[in-house]
UniProtKB/Swiss-Prot annotation:
PROSITE patterns: HTH_MERR_1, HTH_MERR_2. Coiled coil: none annotated. InterPro entries: DNA-bd_dom_put_sf, MerR-type_HTH_dom, MerR_fam. This is Nodulation protein NolA. CDD domains: HTH_NolA-AlbR (cd04788). Involved in genotype-specific nodulation of soybeans. It comes from Bradyrhizobium sp. (strain NC92). Keywords: DNA-binding, Nitrogen fixation, Nodulation. One of its GO terms (biological process) is nitrogen fixation. Residues 13-32 bind DNA. It comes from the Bacteria. The lineage of its organism: Bacteria, Pseudomonadati, Pseudomonadota, Alphaproteobacteria, Hyphomicrobiales.
């Protein structure tokens, strides 16, 4: 006597949700987008799913966790798109997102690491806008060692001259102090462009510059230069 072939197990949609860790609503959405189909229906019209359905849901979840859209997942699972090509394109998107996240991290770090600088809500848009302008500027060709060394030397000289003015209690509006500030503004413009002014320039420059070139630039000296730059006003470069 031939034994009856055992009936393959089937799961109702609620059971499938419990077995795969997704909600019934999500499974309905997968069906609506063509990602999932019931293996059969009961006489009462209830959807039933098999082991292949469970495997497919796990595959969909894995691709979703990688950040793919449902449309991309459907093309890959239907064989219309190479999964390898899809992964490569997704990797490019992730790299862009990582770069943006890194910029955001640096902005937040720049605005919070200096305990002597208080960023108010009113200053926040200007600070973020200034940083964004610097980030969006076309990247210059790498400067030669001679040019880099010259800028570092000029920056050190400006720092020393400005420190001398401050130690002598010269007012930031004095001719000597403004002359040094003008040299500083010229150098800052070479690095950050002419569209940034005042204290925002200093905050951005202080964060973007090589820390070694900022040795000796304590908050008091930076504030002194800030005041001198304000005193320059619209004086031509």
């Amino acid at each position: 006597m031939t034994k009856a072939t055992p009936r393959r197990r089937r799961w109702r949609i609620g059971e499938l949700a419990g077995a795969t860790g997704v909600t019934v609503r999500t499974l309905h959405h997968y069906e609506h987008t063509g990602l999932l189909a019931a293996s059969e229906r009961t006489d009462g019209g209830h959807r039933m799913y098999d082991r292949e359905s469970i495997q497919r849901v796990h595959q969909i979840r894995a691709l979703r966790e990688l950040g793919f859209s449902l449309q991309e997942i459907r093309r890959a699972m239907d064989g219309r798109t190479s999964l390898t090509d899809l992964l490569r394109k997704h990797l490019q998107r992730i790299e862009v997102q990582v770069a943006r996240a890194t910029q955001l991290r640096d902005r937040l770090r720049n605005m919070t690491t200096d305990g002597d600088v208080r960023v108010s809500v009113d200053q926040l848009p200007a600070a973020l806008d200034a940083m964004s302008k610097v980030e969006k500027r076309p990247q210059p060709r790498p400067c030669t060692c001679a040019l880099a060394a010259d800028r570092e030397e000029r920056w050190r000289r400006i720092r020393n001259d400005l420190r001398h003015c401050m130690d002598r209690n010269e007012h930031p509006c004095s001719d000597r102090t403004k002359a040094v500030a003008l040299e500083a503004r010229t150098l800052i413009s070479e690095i950050a462009g002419n569209d940034l002014t005042g204290s925002t320039i200093l905050k951005v420059l202080a964060r973007l510059s090589d820390p070694r070139s900022l040795a000796g630039w304590d908050p008091h000296l930076m504030q002194y230069l800030d005041s001198a730059l304000v005193a320059l006003g619209d004086q031509p470069h």
